C-alpha cells in the first residue's frame, strides 16, 4: 500500500486504520468471526471481525466472497483452528449493467482499499494466522490533532505537530508508542 505523509494516507475522507501483524507468535485454537463497523472512530478492533468484514468489502459477488471464505477456512483447518462465522447480511446493488454485493450489517470505511491486504493474507496462511491470533487493528482518522492520531500511529515514538496560530513545528511524544513495534509488520489503510 502506498503511504504518503507520516505513514498515513493523504486523502480527502481521512479515515485511517493501522494494522499490525506479529512477526512471530503462537496461534490460537479458536476464532470467532463477526461483521463489524469500522470507520473514523478511535477504537481498537478485533482482527478476526475486521478481516471477515474486509472479505465482504473487497468482493463484488457472492461467489467471490465464498471463494475467499473457503480459502480462509482451508487455512484455519490446516492449522487445526476451530472457527465460527457470524451472520453477514447482504444485498445486490446494480449500476447499469454491473452488479455489486453490499453488506447491510457492517462496513469498513472505504473498505475496497484493503483488497491487496486481504489477498496478501489469503496467499500467506502463516501471516494470516498470526494476524488473526495476535494481530492489532486501530481505527481512527487524520482530521484531528496529533495527540489523537497517536492512537493509530503506535510505531512512531514522536509525531509532528504544527501550531497554526504561531506557525511553528514541533514534535510530540506518542503516549501509545509500542517499544516492540519492530516485532510487527505494519499496514496502513486510509481514504
Residue ranges: model-predicted function:
Residues 1-2, 8, 15-191:
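Long, non-globular targeting/processing and low-complexity regions
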